[in-house]
Amino acid sequence: MQLQVLEHIIMKIILEENEMTEYLPEGSLIDTQKNKEALSGIETLKKAQENKTILEAKATVCTAKHDLIVDLGTIRGIIPKNEGAIGIETGETRDIALISRVGKPVCFIITDFEKDKNGRLTAICSRKAVQEECTANYLEKLLPGDIIPAVVTHMENFGC
């Protein structure tokens, strides 16, 4: 159940006035001014890496190796398969969790920059790191009886 929740709640916002951290669904950050500014150039992307800022961009392709390619505007970003979601390496999360993100916004942090064989700069990103942060700072602190803000997005027909 926890992994299903993580697929939708992995975006962090720090509310300036009271320093409270809130985690919202992917897609909530992509059109914000702060996100657009961070994606505006190489220097702002490097600053986001240094600060471990959670960014959001559209996943454009899932490669044959199940790496996600994200459009960072000025350069390309790659989320390697093992950094795409918690549980991918162990098989607890299936590859469809990555494939289904194509064409949709995904949250990530930039962990490194590399030049490809053609000399083009590529950002190496991690979606899993954001999920782990959400788990450590939010989900693991929930207690039975806690009331959390949520939106029902669809119903699933399954039972015990």
Describe the predicted segments one by one:
Residues 3-160:
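Single-stranded RNA-binding regions, centering on S1/OB-family and related RNA-binding modules
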